[in-house]
Amino acid sequence: MMRKKSFWLGMLTAFMLVFTMAFSDSASAAQPAKNVEKDYIVGFKSGVKTASVKKDIIKESGGKVDKQFRIINAAKAKLDKEALKEVKNDPDVAYVEEDHVAHALAQTVPYGIPLIKADKVQAQGFKGANVKVAVLDTGIQASHPDLNVVGGASFVAGEAYNTDGNGHGTHVAGTVAALDNTTGVLGVAPSVSLYAVKVLNSSGSGSYSGIVSGIEWATTNGMDVINMSLGGASGSTAMKQAVDNAYAKGVVVVAAAGNSGSSGNTNTIGYPAKYDSVIAVGAVDSNSNRASFSSVGAELEVMAPGAGVYSTYPTNTYATLNGTSMASPHVAGAAALILSKHPNLSASQVRNRLSSTATYLGSSFYYGKGLINVEAAAQ
């Protein structure tokens, strides 16, 4: 009988012990967690000046000072929920803000780069190094952080080649050669030697004589590629002779076809794009559809992205523009990529590669040979 009593007494004791432990665990779990500290910036009112006073304000509120700034009247502090409340209510505190985290802004790759498969050639290590590209335009903002202008010339009175009061030339230059520097945008050929040849004034206009002078300068100074995102409705014997001479000397000459759109069977391509020695470039959008403004005609050679193109712009910023002016530099950059991989090719060979490997899009009157494919052209 005594054994049975001892047995049940033991069982009762064990049960109470387990119950107590379980209850204790539950009670512990129900306890509120300790307030988590977070980083804040605490700003002080103008009357609070000394470091010791600032430190005391935060310390007396239950926080801890990590750093005091040298110029602004503020300190970085660690505060839990209660300390945060106390600091906010302190009459000597002007503001309290969370110490947020910033991130490096990634480089934007405009849609035109993968559309023409320039990224594939860049990935092979060919980015236009040792190739000289002259942008004949409104000048280039040479101080733009995403551009590296190595030289140039101006044929516009009173305007330097390394400035751009219009924006057109800087935008075109970025499509050709915006740097691969983890910020801003990426150009088709980011490692080219970029030259600014100003032939258009800050209003976006320029004389044919100025353009001829720019072409001659580029030819004389050993440019490998000339881009002309410009055009006129009238032909010019002098301009034709200038581009013919450049092409004969081994320069790949690229020009915008024009923004006159289509009107039945009417040829709307402008000059100098209309000349045989020049690659006339039309514009497509991100879906490879011909842009409605893109000029048409028998001289149209290839198409490139020209609708909604994002690129560099003055001053130290970026902009989205439309036009065959935006398409032409894609082709100029593509020519530079081909030459960086195959430096011994002639201008006519580069041109033939671009046109013969283009992706067919439709009638040559509207699309030329089609959308350029730099990966195929650079094989």
Curated annotation (Swiss-Prot):
It is found in: Secreted. Residues 110-378 form the Peptidase S8 domain. Ca(2+) 2 binds at residues 273, 275, 278. Residues 1-29 form the signal peptide. Inhibited by p-chlorophenyl and 1-naphthyl boronic acid derivatives. Disulfide bonds: none annotated. Binds 2 calcium ions per subunit. InterPro entries: Peptidase_S8/S53_dom, Peptidase_S8/S53_dom_sf, Peptidase_S8_Asp-AS, Peptidase_S8_His-AS, Peptidase_S8_Ser-AS, Peptidase_S8_subtilisin-like, Peptidase_S8_subtilisin-rel, S8pro/Inhibitor_I9. It catalyses: Hydrolysis of proteins with broad specificity for peptide bonds, and a preference for a large uncharged residue in P1. Hydrolyzes peptide amides. Keywords: Calcium, Hydrolase, Metal-binding, Protease, Secreted, Serine protease, Signal, Zymogen. Residues 30-105 form a propeptide. The active site is at 137 (charge relay system), 168 (charge relay system), 325 (charge relay system). It comes from the Bacteria. Used as a detergent protease. Sold under the name Alcalase by Novozymes. One of its GO terms (biological process) is proteolysis. This is Subtilisin Carlsberg.
